[in-house]
Amino acid sequence: MLKKVVAVFSSVFLIMGCGNKNANNNTENQSMDQVEKSDTEMYMLVGTYTSGESKGIYVYKLDTVTGTSKYISEVKVDNPSYLVLDPSEKFVYSVTEDDGVETSAANAFSFDKQDGKLTFINKQLTGGGAPCYINIDSEGKHVVTANYSGGSLTYFSVNEKGGLETASQVISFAGKGADTERQKQSHIHCVQFTPDGKFLFANDLGTDKIHKFNVNESGDNFLSVGNPAAFTVKGGSGPRHLKFHPNNKFAYVITELSGDVIAFDYNDGNLKEIQTIKADTVNAKGSGDIGITPNGKFLYASNRLKNDGLAIFSINEADGKLTKVGYRTTGVHPRNFAITPNGKLLLVACRDNDVIQVFKIDENTGLLEDTGHDIKLDMPVCVKFASIE
């Protein structure tokens, strides 16, 4: 996220209780009430910014081998810049990213996997401005948002109907970083449950820390401060997103400001840095997202503002270290991307030229080939997949 904020927090504290560009030559409207299922097709859900022509979340049917797609449906919601599906894929949760505390929210939807339609359930305020990331635990009972301008994270429990209860924890953070323009205060940009579900990590772009929390299934607070309370990365880095390797032994962080990928050994809630390698070689200070192929062989990191594209790395599965193998230019401002579960395609949401690009992944080299099956949509910023029933 690229915003300037001026508030500075001096302490860490816990507060309790507290239109549509959807088609081009490769994307056609799907008018059937019932979506036909094939072995290679999945739903693709896309979050957008809604200051222009987009209205909310869009659903497509994507062939995960050819890269062709069909528009299915949409649901109106303000600025759903990040989405997550629950483990059953019957419910979808999004942020409403807005700077105002009174309008920043988390939203719940039911998802009919037979007709590909989303139905709004409810929303709850996050209590922190500009929520830009949302995640859910492996049981589908607990939702957490990362609030960028609020310098906080928010916890919600999920009820039996898939709706969100009122926020029961808002955790705010202290400090600032070395970059006097971009790190004037805490900026939480990602919340990630560990593979075993015992901990939650929160990347703080503003203070160069990865905060650690214990996950408590019982007791008053779902989240409690971990030991250590945080892991610190190099000053001025701006840790943005974190992903775990499929073998659960390694974690990788993309840093927005320094343009690095940091590799960590992961063990029982602890991170040990093993490598830092450049993703952005032109000092654009706009690195965005990070992703790993399902087979664990390749890692991708997106860069924005200059030389927009994806840095491509191979992964040594023995020690977790990365080797750069290529770079693929993309459309303008690749804020987010997603790899299909079969590992064959990588789709890039290019916010500033209103397109989702569809690339084929070379299974041997990790390099990307443009399929030409672009999906035109105003300001796409998040891509997720779900199976078709």
Task: Give each language-model segment a name.
Residues 61-67, 109-116, 156-165, 213-222, ...:
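Short loop/turn segments immediately following beta-strands, especially the blade-tip
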Residues 50-53, 97-102, 149-152, 207-209, ...:
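Short glycine/acidic-enriched loop and turn motifs that connect beta-strands
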